[in-house]
Amino acid sequence: MVTQVLIAHTGQRLEIDSRTITSLNGLKESVASQTSIPVECLIALTPQGRSLRWQPTQPETEIYIYDSRLTQRSQPGASSPPLSELPLPRYNAHTPPNSIEDTRSIPAWQKLFETRRAWAIDVVEDCARMDAATRERYAEMDVMLRCLDAAVANLENAVKGLENKYVELKEWSTSAQAEYSALATGFDRYLSLARGIAISSSMARFMTSRDDGGWKGRPQRQSTLEDLVDLELARQAGKLAPSALRKFKDRITNLDKAATHLFQDADTLMHKFETTMSRSALSHDGESLHLLKDIEALANKIDNDYNVTLEYTSSTRDTLLQVSKTAAHHTERLLPSIQKRALEMGDILCYATKARNSLAAESIEFMRSITEITSDSHSVKSQISETGQEDELATFDHLRLIQQIPYLYASFVAEAIRRREWLDKVKQDSTTLANEMAIFHEEEAKRRRRWHKSIGAVFGPAPTADSKVPNLEINLRGDDGEWPLMTRKDLDDFFNALRNQKADPELVVEIEKLIADMDKSTRQQSRRMKAFKNGSVHETALGRSGLLVRGDDDLLRSLQADKTRLESKLKTAESRVRRLEDLLHRQTQASRPNVGNLFQNPSQQVLDRNDSISSLRNPRAVDDRSRSLDGLETLIHRTQQLETELNTERERCVVLEREINALTTLHNDLKGQMDEANSTKKDLLQNMEALKREFTEERKSLEEEVKQLKARLEYTEDEIEHFGESRENEKASYDEKVHFLELEVERLTRERRDDSLKADDQVVLLQNEARLQRERIAAQDIELRAAQDEIRVLSKRLEAVTEDKQKYRQALEDIWECLAPADDVPTELPDLLEGITGKAADILNTKQGVEGDMSLMKLNVDTLQNNIRTLRSEMDFTKDRLTEEESVSLRLREKFSEERAKVVAMEGELAHGREQLHEFRVKIADGETGSEYMRKRLEDEEQNLASMTEELAAGQTQVQKMEEEVTRFKAKLHQTQMQLSELSIRLESRTECAKDLTQLLWSQNDRLTRLLERLGFSISREEDGTMHIQRTPRSERSLATTANPNDSDPSSSLRRSSTLNARPVTDNADLELLQWMSSATPEAEVEKYKIFMGLIGSLDMDVFADAVYRRVKDVEHMARKLQREARAYREKAHSFQKEAHDKIAFKHFKEGDLALFLPTRNQSTGAWAAFNVGFPHYFLREQDSHRLRNREWLVARIMRIQERVVDLSKSLQHDQAGETRKDGARGETESLDDDENDNPFDLSDGLRWYLIEAVEDKPGAPSTPGLAKSTVAANNVEAMADMRTQGHISKARGLTGRGGTPLGIEGVSKTLSKSLESRRSSTGSRKTLPFVIGASSRGRESALASETNSLRAVPADNNSSAPTNAAQQHMSPTDKLKDESLQETPQQTNSISAEGESMTIAARNDQAILQPSQTHSEVRNEIESLIGP
């Protein structure tokens, strides 16, 4: 058996044959011969941390070896063994070959590929060596950690055992210190107590074993407890007690310190070991192997490309182009990747070596710490063992004897009393027994004499003197005469004296318990008293101790007390039984209704209850009531019915509970979905808030930096100002010493002048720094403006990128659903891409596995077919042979019947011959003389008889053999038929499995092909069957999407098409090939199988995997790029979110926006409209706080928007005043109370308009109109400016809209001339969804189709219309951010120019709308080139 030997400090692993080792020394010598560790320095442990004990019969599988030289701290001047530290390896990867002689020559390219292949092979070999070295380092680390774990386990076992002993000693020492302190301090009190308590002199002499001569020399006095103590020894112990107590306490204190230090060091070591295990580098084990596989895969790719180039013979243009592309691919990707991974492999080896060296150093430190802790544990253990064995504790033993002397005396007295009482009882019982036996003896003697006189004298011997009745003699041997005679009164007097002297309460309690134990009965007496149990008498217990119980007054008293107690219990139980019977009778008669009163009213039932209660008091009424129990059967039947109904209700409750559980499960599922959605929203909001906090912190840091610079500048200026003042004050303080320090003053003056010059220079320098800082701030402002412009542009790109990202994510999700419809779609895009890659790899593995199974199945089918052919031939041969055997058997049977007939005939002849022979013999016996003829005949008959007997035996034997052969052939035929049926069943099952595998393989192949087509690839095959996967041109992709020209979402095409799992195999034209195993002939089966395998094998899985891998990687790269851009756009958009809140809106009005309200031309109705671009008919509801009569404009924040439609037909009918309006926030219609609210601004019928409630946000408008100015004139000017802006934008359209429709006053007139019915049914008055195709044209028409649009700003060329529904007015924050990021509204000032601002807004609006479409198309084209249509 091989034993693994692990070396702790080097990490080596040795193997030793345990059969050749017989002892531990032999093991150490074997290990020392293979390592550099001497035998005397070897330490061996088991994996459990125990010391090794060699057992040749059951050797250990692993042994851990340690070097004791490394586990000890090196002494100064002593030589320590060298540490096991390996040098750090360095790997330098050579530059891959990249030179070629002739780029137009195929051999030159082949030579280049060959050199690159050789370089790659060398790198792979180097990486393999580094991988082996890395794994060896990790194996050494594993060995070190395991050895360290065993050492720590050894220490833990030792410390745990020591800790238990220390805890026990600590508990004992605490109580011992208190006891020893009490003994040392109460020594004099104990002696005075012993001196004052009198005792019996005889007991004192008995306890001290002194003879009478020792007491005769002393004066006659009353003996006390002091006489029982050796006074000299006691006084000496009293003197030594304080010093012994102090030494004991010091020893316990030192032990506590040492043990605490030991346990703390052990805990620290355990914590460090756990930390070392947690941060171990073993978790990185295996990385080098994965990296080596990647390098080998890249090298194999280079090798494959080299083999492909060897096939090229001619230097054609296409061949050179293909070779150059492959070489460029190697140069750009493969070779740098191999070089990079080789360097990474070297770094991994270096990291593993560093970790190994670090762990070796740590393990040595651990070993040294463990050695120190172990030595400390030995010292603590020796202290613990020595604590309870010191000679000083004998002092306290003497003191404890003095303290316990009253109890000892009381115990001796009680023992003397017990012995005397027992002896008296034994004497009394023996006398009683002797008397009783004497009576029995006399009665037996009288009976014998009477019998002998009457009967015995007739027979038998005469009575003699020896024929006496056996007698019983009782002798008591031994005597307790040595013990003094003591009585209970002596013990009671001693106890009372002890209490009067106020002895220790504990001592008094112990003596009192001792006195009480004297009255307790023995175990045999207790069994005698408890002989009556469970209604029977235990005669065994009654007879064993009957003598000792008889005549004992104490036992009689205890028996009487037990009898009284049992009688009281019996009375209590009887009274309780009566009460329970009474309650049961009441419940039976009063609570349960009988048959007669089931339908009584409550009053009658109350009367019945009263009657029943009164009847309980009357015995006769109780008898009458008891007779009414005959109706209980009816009640029992009723009870059964109620129980049946109760069971029915319980079943119904169970059904309801199941329904409730199902609803609860459904509710929990819905709640879980809601929680998941809320968590997703919460995560998004947290991300946005985190970005906001980052920008805020950055802005604060910049502001703090500016503040610090300003404070520094101010501080420097203050120093310059106070510099002169401080010098003047200093000069004034030294005026009294001017005549002594004139030279010093001059020197100080010169220094001050120099300092002033330096300060001036510093001021100039700080001024220059401040100027540079201002310039830097100005440059930052410029950069900030440029960044704001860039953010506007990027925000537009962000919208397009976000939409495309959502589309392509949906496409990836559809691909996931096609690949794994049963699994959940991952939420993160990288997880989704990795999942798709994994699913594709699983599909490839499944296909390869199916192909392998098909090949195995084919081999099995061929084997089975051969077996079937062999079995069929054997069956045919067996049938033929069986037929022959049956015919032979028939012939044999016929022959057997013939032979049997012959045998019967021969038996008859034989019987006849025997008769004749018998007759002949009779005649011969009678004396007749026969002739020679008779003798010959007799001989012939005998010969015939013998031959016929032999023939009969041979025929019987042959018949028996034939029957056995027939039976054997029948068994063989049955066995062959069974094998044939089993093989047929097995062949059918394998055929079904082959059919399933064929269908599965075909469906997988078809799904993979369609997956490539949907990913934007096209598959082409050459004549030799080689498959090529190419990108589908964009023109063909566009043809694939012409089914729905309005649907540009690539995921929609995937959704329109059937899923990968939905297409059945039966729809394929090659259905017959899937049934190749059901062919009629073997030749057709083989032919169909070959065709099927050719079609299946045409899909090259390597090419497919490479194409899908590259596509997924490209999509992943693009997704990361889009994520980075989206993150940047989102960060920049958040920084301007607050600014957009304070800008004036001119389109897409919603609650919370700032709007500029201007008066319209219709001054008679007091109509004020919101400044807008393409969003007319937003009128202001006038309030008293607005003071519109004294204003030219009003900037207010929108609080509410109400949508209304003018309907003049209601005013003609006079049925009900009111109209339908729609709230902009909730989309609900309400009715007005009067006609004035229906059309307050005299608008035309069928017109949709909006009433705005706003609160002034920016006061400061002039109170009165300026001189020679009016709102109508301002509006006219603005309308002209808008018309010029429109002409500037559209250029070719002029004043006409789409299709030549006039957009000026003529358009307004033509719009107003429409009929009421047509205007109500027009598209301008209907609610339309936002972002619908053609909404932009309707927005332009509706924008200029009203006579109340005072601000005739021509709308920009956009794709959005007025917010005509509640969904658009309740936009999400993201949509609001998109809308606000596309707007650039002017800031409100005290004086506003409507003309200039309308032109600027229109221009910026056009620019903001044109840029997203361009960016969208660019990003769309870039992503389509990666993922396909």
From Swiss-Prot:
Residues 1230-1239 have a biased composition (Acidic residues). It holds the Pfam family ATG11. InterPro entries: ATG11, Atg11_C, ATG17-like_dom. Residues 143-173, 553-590, 632-815, 851-989, 1105-1143 form a coiled coil. Homodimer. Involved in cytoplasm to vacuole transport (Cvt), pexophagy, mitophagy and nucleophagy. Recruits mitochondria for their selective degradation via autophagy (mitophagy) during starvation. Works as scaffold proteins that recruit ATG proteins to the pre-autophagosome (PAS), the site of vesicle/autophagosome formation. Required for the Cvt vesicles completion. This is Autophagy-related protein 11. It comes from Neurospora crassa (strain ATCC 24698 / 74-OR23-1A / CBS 708.71 / DSM 1257 / FGSC 987).
